[in-house]
A protein has these predicted regions:
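Active-site region of glycoside hydrolase catalytic domains
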Residues: 2-61, 85, 105, 114-373, ...
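Active-site-adjacent substrate/metal-binding segments within catalytic domains
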Residues: 46-116
Length: 446
């Protein structure tokens, strides 16, 4: 990237980084075969996913704005992929909607399966590598009625769904993600009550659900490899940078360690080593080791943690309080999250200890100001480049998101897209930041 094109903020960022670390080589080149692209998820873009638990949650008035038609991506995927191709993307992450494949228990919608086959063929025809998520937060209403993630049989139902999908779609997909952000799902659904099933402070149930999610991942891992031995199978792990609310307070520093382990390492460590542990609290051996071929990293921001006692909930910090964002030191995005690029390199280095490839499966900013999007993107890619230069095996970067979409409880106010969507007309417009990202992709270098 020509230095003359850099904004004042970018220059300041680069200067700050260079002052505290060895300089990054000019015109840093990313590895050959690096995956460049963006990501979406079914419920957030397809529209009218009427058979899942999130649709029921919305219709019950649990969110201010329901998903409705979303981006109508179900009908517009080809033209959306044309835009991705025009931007030079060589990879695209999306999810298959379980409730479309199996809208009623044991009843398979072959039309939906064929639709996703056409999605995969459309990507392949455009030279775009699919990265497919099997479970991105939503489940069929019938599964939710059985107890959802609290039902010990869910791994069996997920495996049956995966077998049906792999039987038809397996030849077209090498990269698979079993679960998206399982720990976030547990926090939002069983501790904060903000997402289905709407439990609050249900710590014992939350730990049970985490175990079931781990077992489900293992079952899915083996199903995928049975159909496609050369598959690359991982999860998308939400990585949340954490700092103590008061660095002088020992209890806050300890809470950062506990919450950091629970949120950022517990799931991956368990799948890699077979040990489910929280230091000083519990340890359990599970038959789940060595079931990650890569680690997907979703990274957005940093939180500040204040200890609120010496129970597990207290050690994690006040997970229900908005104070986590009160003391942010950096620039805030439209959802009040701090822009903290250093955290991405931190996690790339931390996760490299597992000695398996890392794919950045989400990284983006909700903002109406596209200049901020470009600065965010550049600063985070700078951190990726620095980590790779230090020897981290990072194989790709997928920006969140390709298009503006339905952002769960935040509705449509969070504009993450490289491509702007007018939700009244469904018109698309490529943002300037997307073209600047395209130039990095074209050159495969910063």
């Amino acid at each position: 990237m020509d230095a003359r094109e850099l904004s004042e903020l970018e220059h300041a960022f680069v200067a700050a980084q260079e002052s505290s670390a060895p300089p990054l080589a000019a015109n840093f080149r990313f590895p050959d075969g690096f995956l460049w692209g963006a990501a979406t998820s079914a419920h957030q873009v397809e529209g009218h996913n009427v058979h899942n638990d999130w649709w029921a949650w919305e219709q019950a008035g649990r969110v201010a704005t329901p998903s409705g038609a979303a981006c109508d991506h179900w009908n517009r995927f080809r033209s959306d992929f044309d835009l991705a191709q025009s931007l030079g993307h060589n990879a695209h992450r999306f999810s298959i909607e379980w409730s479309r494949i199996e809208p009623e228990e044991g009843i398979w919608d072959e039309t939906a399966i064929e639709h996703y086959r056409e999605v995969l063929l459309a990507l392949r025809e455009r030279g775009i590598e699919p990265v497919v998520t099997l479970f991105h937060y939503t489940m069929p209403k019938w599964m939710a009625a059985r107890g959802g993630w609290e039902d010990p049989k869910i791994e069996r139902y997920l495996a049956r769904y995966a077998e049906h999908v792999l039987g038809r779609l397996g030849p077209h997909v090498r990269w698979w993600i079993t679960l998206n952000e399982p720990v976030v799902h547990v926090f939002k659904g069983w501790l904060l009550g903000q997402w289905p099933p709407g439990r609050t402070r249900a710590w014992a149930t939350a730990l049970k659900v985490l175990r079931l999610m781990m077992r489900a991942h293992v079952r899915l891992y083996h199903v995928i490899h049975a159909f496609r031995p050369d598959a690359r199978v991982g999860i998308a792990q939400h990585a949340l940078a954490l700092s103590p609310d008061d660095p002088r307070r020992w209890s806050d520093r300890w809470s950062v360690k506990v919450r950091g382990h629970l949120f950022n390492h517990l799931f991956i460590e368990a799948l890699h080593t077979g040990a489910l542990r929280v230091p000083g609290l519990f340890w359990e051996r599970l038959p789940i080791a060595r079931t990650l071929d890569f680690i997907g990293v979703n990274y957005y921001t940093r939180d500040f943690v204040r200890n609120s006692g010496y129970t597990l909930a207290g050690l994690v910090g006040d997970a229900e309080a908005e104070r986590d964002h009160r003391q942010q030191r950096g620039k805030l995005n439209d959802l009040g999250w701090e822009v903290y690029p250093e955290g991405l390199a931190q996690f790339l280095r931390e996760y490299s200890r597992y000695k398996i490839p890392i794919l950045i499966t989400e990284n983006g900013i909700p903002t109406q100001r596209d200049d901020d999007r470009w600065v965010f993107l550049f600063m985070h890619l700078w951190q990726v480049a620095r980590a790779i230069a230090d020897g981290v095996d990072c194989v790709g970067y997928l920006h969140w998101s390709l298009i503006d979409n339905f952002e769960w409880a935040d509705g449509y106010k969070a504009r993450f897209g490289l491509i702007e969507v007018d939700f009244e007309t469904q018109e698309r417009r490529i943002r300037p930041s997307a073209w600047r990202y395209a130039e990095i992709i074209r050159r495969n270098e910063l």
